[in-house]
């Protein structure tokens, strides 16, 4: 984010220097902004800072845990077996992507990261490392250490996703992939350890050709200041995941209806799908997707039957098909 701000400032300075932007016009725009700030804050009492910060943090933790989406859980690798050794790999475990960039940013009272709170959970942590760099640089020594750590662990928790440069306001994404260095490391880890739990952080839909590398995928989106403890609450079985996707995840960018018309060569953007936006397009065109709108697993399994669709709603019978999930049961180490 700091890099984006610096680039924006440099662009404005360069525009003034080369004559593309008049300094008087820039002064006028800044003046309008200052006037708006003064008008909105004049005579208003500042918000009370004497609030229960811990209670607010716990509320953020609860909201994050109830929002996270379990996309995959092969062979019930989750919740974690506390007896198995675990390697935690990924820059996002140390520097979480907990909120959006630009004007959506707010000041948290505190921010958790997974690496700092793991000791609060009854887990057998073999080791932790970044493995990849947030800015795309490659540290070969750390990468080798990550692969060696993964090779010697029973389970790998891999924290990855879109960084702040990949998605923000004021710019359009040029593709739907996560950074390639993260994918490369994930694929290499999968060659030495098949028990990978992917912890995904991203603010929008992405391509997931690498999903076969993971036995489980837990998607946190941008899960706030208490996202790390919320994630571990789900991984350890303290919370049963219940979140659902609010958008469709296509298999590839080429499946999206705007693919042929983006980026636009004109001054306007074309939305030729009309009312068939989002899930409406995929449902209508019968396109097979990676994960559909509304998808989400839990540690409990259900069946649906007797579906009745009426003008004012839907009726359906839901049957629990396994033992009601309350907490992870003890397992023998293998």
Task: Give the location of each predicted region.
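Acidic active-site catalytic centers that drive phospho-/nucleotidyl reactions
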Residues: 154, 320, 332
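Single conserved hydrophobic/aromatic residue that forms the stacking wall/gate
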Residues: 1-5, 9, 325-334
């Amino acid at each position: 984010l700091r890099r984006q701000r610096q680039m924006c400032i440099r662009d404005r300075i360069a525009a003034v220097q080369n004559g593309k932007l008049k300094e008087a016009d820039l002064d006028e725009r800044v003046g309008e902004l200052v006037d708006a700030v003064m008008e909105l804050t004049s005579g208003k009492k500042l918000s009370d800072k004497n609030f229960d910060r811990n209670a607010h943090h716990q509320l953020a933790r609860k909201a994050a845990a109830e929002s996270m989406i379990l996309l995959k859980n092969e062979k019930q690798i989750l919740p974690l077996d506390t007896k198995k050794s675990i390697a935690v790999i990924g820059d996002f475990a140390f520097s979480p992507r907990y909120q959006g960039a630009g004007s959506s940013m707010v000041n948290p009272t505190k921010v958790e990261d997974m690496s700092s709170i793991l000791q609060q959970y009854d887990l057998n942590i073999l080791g932790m490392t970044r493995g990849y760099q947030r800015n795309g640089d490659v540290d070969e020594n750390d990468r080798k250490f990550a692969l060696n750590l993964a090779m010697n662990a029973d389970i790998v928790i891999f924290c990855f996703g879109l960084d702040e440069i990949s998605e923000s306001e004021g710019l359009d994404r040029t593709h739907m992939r996560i950074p390639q260095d993260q994918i490369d490391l994930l694929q290499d880890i999968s060659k030495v350890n098949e028990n990978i739990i992917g912890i995904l952080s991203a603010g929008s839909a992405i391509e997931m050709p690498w999903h076969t590398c993971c036995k489980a995928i837990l998607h946190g989106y941008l899960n706030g200041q208490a996202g790390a403890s919320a994630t571990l609450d789900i991984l350890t079985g303290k919370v049963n995941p219940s979140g659902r996707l609010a958008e469709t995840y296509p298999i590839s960018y080429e499946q999206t209806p705007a693919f042929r018309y983006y980026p636009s060569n004109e001054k306007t953007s074309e939305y030729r799908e009309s009312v068939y936006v989002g899930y409406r397009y995929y449902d209508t065109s019968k396109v097979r997707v990676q994960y559909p709108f509304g998808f989400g697993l839990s540690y409990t399994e259900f069946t649906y039957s007797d579906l009745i669709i009426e003008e004012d709603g839907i009726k359906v019978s839901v049957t629990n098909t396994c033992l009601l999930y309350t907490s992870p049961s003890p397992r023998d180490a293998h």
